[in-house]
Amino acid sequence: EENDSILKQHNDAIRDFSFKIASPVEKWRALQMKGYTDFQLCTQYPGLMIGTGNEHSLKMDDAIKCGFSFDYTTGLPYIPGSSLKGALRACFPGDGKKEEISQEYAAYIRALLDKEDVDIEQLKENIFENRDIFLGAFPVIGFTGKKLLEMEFITPHTSGRFKNPNPISQIKVRPDVKFDFCFILSDDCSEDGTVIVSAEEKKKLFKQLILDMGMGAKTHVGFGHFSERRPIQLREIAVSQPNRTNNRYGQSNRGQNQYNRGRR
């Protein structure tokens, strides 16, 4: 019971912690580094898990079972540049993929670039082996408040280490948190100086790949997906419609009316 109380306090502290330190993005922008660029995307429900494979030392039954990625300098939850680079590289052909699958990935990249004659293998090498730099992604503090984290409980039903169907405690970034995705990019040019794929085209490509494929752990069950716009919250809809008729409990009748219509 004592351990349970301690763990609950720790978990509550994680959930309620308010981040006050700004990310380094504003400083990067102010430096006006050659090739620096960024774009913003919002996490979608149920949120973002990143760095779950990081080492975590607590072994108690109800302790958080997986690690997480926190920036060493600011303490902010973030997507490391290496993770961002790896996730984007996985969207390109090669790296052990079957030939048929690689061809599909190549066609997908060409379609996003709207360039049928681009050499995807050369583009891949130029992006991931040469000059382009992946700085990572940092949350925008104050966009939806300063509380960024929530607890997530997953109940596996598999054999092995977690064979008992007991909930596993994990950390996630909340839905509706805006992230800055940051890069230093350069144009890809032919020998005569003709631009084949510009830095701006790369930026748009990366943005669409993240929107399509997601980022982080458990994307196949909904985590790690982003959108360009923050979803409208139900409470915001309620505020924008103050004249709706409420029932005797102070609750809107709108949902009940829809339910009743559905039963007819």
Locations of regions flagged by a protein language model:
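Basic, Gly/Ser/Thr-rich N-terminal segments that form RNA-phosphate-binding interfaces in CRISPR RAMP
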Residues: E1-R264
